Amino acid sequence: MPKVEIQLNLGENDYDPQEFVNAAVYGEELGFRTAWFGDHIFPWFHSGKRSSFVWSMLSVALEKTDRMKVGPWVTVPIGARYHPAIVAQAAATLDNMYPGRVLLGVGSGEALNERPFWNGTWPKWDERIERLIEGIRLIRMMWDSKEPFKFEGKYFSSDFYHLYTKPRRKIPILFSAIGKRAARYAGIYADQLITICPRNDIQRMKEVILPAYRQGRLEANKTGRGGVAIEVNFSFLTPEEIVRSQWRTLGIYHKDSWSIPNPVAVEEEGRRVTVDEVRKGTHFCSRWSELVEVIEQYAKIGVTAVSLYTGADRKLMRAVARNVLSVF
């Protein structure tokens, strides 16, 4: 069986911050080596009434665990909610205290969390991805440069940048990509690719996403196939049961969810999400062995890590450890 790491995705909604931290601690006790935290100022649905600051939780989770690697899935250093220099400092400070245990997932963002910081506007994807690429370049320069430097970019410029507290180890940058162009950019500019399924199903991953990612790595003269982490959305309910009982949380299934500006509007969109949309966005299983088979298929085409969303649900975490983690 191909080697693949099973990781936890704790998310950012549904629970209080201490519960997320405790979940990371419990995950380590269960044998997981990596836990991802969502990075939102607003949750995906309004009535959940929770959304905690990820960098606060990451620091406490690192202190309370011994070996667990943690990071944001994903942060958005495009100059709105976060300037790249702030992200560089935040990640470097954590790695300085907890070397080798910090991951940095980055992406181009969604309107839900970023639009309020653009004075009511929302840049097109092309601009956001340019900002992300330039932001990654600035972050790396701040980590690596031993002397102050001048930076003149299209979006970020200053005659003085210098990071005084450096990371102790190289911090992996994981680039979130849903489409072909972003996957290629992940190969060029980042250390690893992260994506979601079944939006990117086996066939699309094999024929579109992974070839584009590897082409990018080739263009950047990188060796090896590169790490690929994928979040597998799964459920043991039926699509009909989810639409009936969990409609408040379903706005993210909407095809334009990345452009919806606030959690009240996202939640309202959940009323209009169809059974077919839910079916296309989730791997539905009747037994754990079916989920294991899905993960095996992704591993065979080159996926190196699979992130499973559990939130801080200890019962679900135990079930994942017993039925999935133990297999791999």
Regions found by a protein language model. Name each.
Residues 1-328:
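Active-site-adjacent structural elements that line small-molecule/cofactor binding pockets in enzymes
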